[in-house]
UniProtKB/Swiss-Prot annotation:
Protein name: Probable endonuclease 4
Organism: Pectobacterium carotovorum subsp. carotovorum (strain PC1)
Phylogenetic lineage: Bacteria, Pseudomonadati, Pseudomonadota, Gammaproteobacteria, Enterobacterales
Cofactor note: Binds 3 Zn(2+) ions.
Binding site for Zn(2+) 3: 182, 229, 231
Enzymatic reactions: Endonucleolytic cleavage to 5'-phosphooligonucleotide end-products
Binding site for Zn(2+) 1: 69, 109, 145
Keyword NAD: no
Amino acid sequence: MKYIGAHVSASGGVDQAVIRAHEIKATAFALFTKNQRQWQAAPLSTEVIDRFKAACEQYAYTSAQILPHDSYLINLGHPDAEALEKSRIAFIDEMARCQQLGLSLLNFHPGSHLKQIEEADCLARIAESINIALAETDGVTAVIENTAGQGSNLGFRFEHLAAIIDGVEDKSRVGVCIDTCHAFAGGYDLRTEADCEATFAEFDRIVGFRYLRGMHLNDAKSAFASRVDRHHSLGEGNIGKTAFSYIMKDARFDGIPMILETINPDIWADEIAWLKSEAQC
């Protein structure tokens, strides 16, 4: 079973994200549980939590179909001790919010060394940050997203993801989300079926499909191996539709939320319908 949706707005309350997902006939969705560009947010009230859970029940979304994303401000590998602590506190809050909402996944960008510490040191800090957050929360899996490798962001090589996982003590509560645009920009080709075979074989060898907890399905405005993160609508970018058809037909991608973050929300319903049709072929 393929779970397909988009990252929908939670404007007006997290329960509104559920309704917006239903309106585009999504069978999965992503959301921010707080303002993604602010460090702090008001705690979730019992009323807000109850409305969200009721909406999920009404529209038949389980936690396996929902991939919340954390704040863009958080850097779990920050080289500065004070800034690192601030990020860790914010990440624990994000995990706790997911736990309160009955959600079992939290997607996040791993972190950046800011050209101040070695890659290995940054990756170790990220793993330690995850360990701290897992110890403070229950039932939520930390889902590391691969990056395009812009600036000093780590996570653009599968080896980075594997190194972080290696440092996480509770392997049952860590996973990865593969963003197709980020992978392509990071140097993993997806333009042909043969490219997809090679890229996902490498992913399986280095990380392992057992850790795959979600996908971000995005075409790329950016060039192959450019280390530039620019999303595009499916079939309109430099990846093309072949990769997305391949993913829809491959059972290794069953049972996880697959989320559009493509640039035109007006055609998300059409993109979802096309992906569903490919999954049926």
